[in-house]
Amino acid sequence: MHNNSKKNIIWQKHSVTRIKREQKNGHKSIVIWFTGLSGSGKSSIANSLEEILFQNNFNTYLLDGDNIRSSLCSDLSFSILDRNENIRRIGEVSKLMIDAGIIVLVSVISPYRNQRKKIRLMLGKINFLEVFVDTPLNICEERDPKKLYQKSRLGKISDLTGIQSLYEIPEKPDLHLDETISLKNNTKKLIHILCDKNIISFPNIDETFLF
């Protein structure tokens, strides 16, 4: 029944295309995928980048892992199967957003290499920018903004990534960020790579990039 139903679904083509939206927006669309441990600084960097892009009239949207878990994926647990489904759903939403001509920032742990590989394949290599926010576990645990590491050490959480659950470090991320350096410098690196890939035009970055 399920397979027969899928045969009756036909993707509808629209006259307003991604290319037309990008031309109107004045920039290309892309997914910037921030991966790293809880407390690594993914959301802070993603938020900083979005703020700069927004201030300069680029169309953006930030998909934060906790926000998605509270809404679209509120029915999912933290089992491996549900973690994979969580990432798949975020990937599908991201795919729609790049078709809308938006620069999509995704801040989510996404601990498994296979997950991230599938998203890259789903979106297409040129549409996916993997950013590894590389912060040592001990620093993440010292920060512990959500008290997750504390709960994990007390046995109140049994599946925290980096403690009981594996985090697979990206082997060849598009950008490797050290979160222990300044937020401004990391944000500037991201602006530079977006310019290098011709996603955006940001003249005189070093002179105008002040915040």
Swiss-Prot record:
Keyword flag Phosphoprotein: yes
Quote one Gene Ontology molecular function term: ATP binding
- Give the EC class as a word: transferase
What positions constitute the catalytic site? S110 (phosphoserine intermediate)
User: Sorted alphabetically, which keywords does the UniProt record give?
Assistant: ATP-binding, Kinase, Nucleotide-binding, Phosphoprotein, Transferase
Please give the coiled-coil regions recorded for this protein: none
Q: Name one Pfam family in it.
A: APS_kinase
CDD domains, alphabetized = APSK
Please name the GO terms of the biological process aspect recorded for this protein, alphabetically: hydrogen sulfide biosynthetic process; sulfate assimilation
Where ATP binds, per the record, is at G36, L37, S38, G39, S40, G41, K42, S43
Annotated catalysed reactions = adenosine 5'-phosphosulfate + ATP = 3'-phosphoadenylyl sulfate + ADP + H(+)
Give the enzyme's EC designation: 2.7.1.25
Q: In which pathway does it act?
A: Sulfur metabolism; hydrogen sulfide biosynthesis; sulfite from sulfate: step 2/3
Protein function: Catalyzes the synthesis of activated sulfate.
Q: Which NCBIfam families match?
A: apsK, PRK03846.1
- Name the family the entry cites: Belongs to the APS kinase family.
Q: This chain belongs to which protein, by name?
A: Adenylyl-sulfate kinase
Native source species: Buchnera aphidicola subsp. Schizaphis graminum (strain Sg)
Question: By which gene is this protein encoded?
Answer: cysC
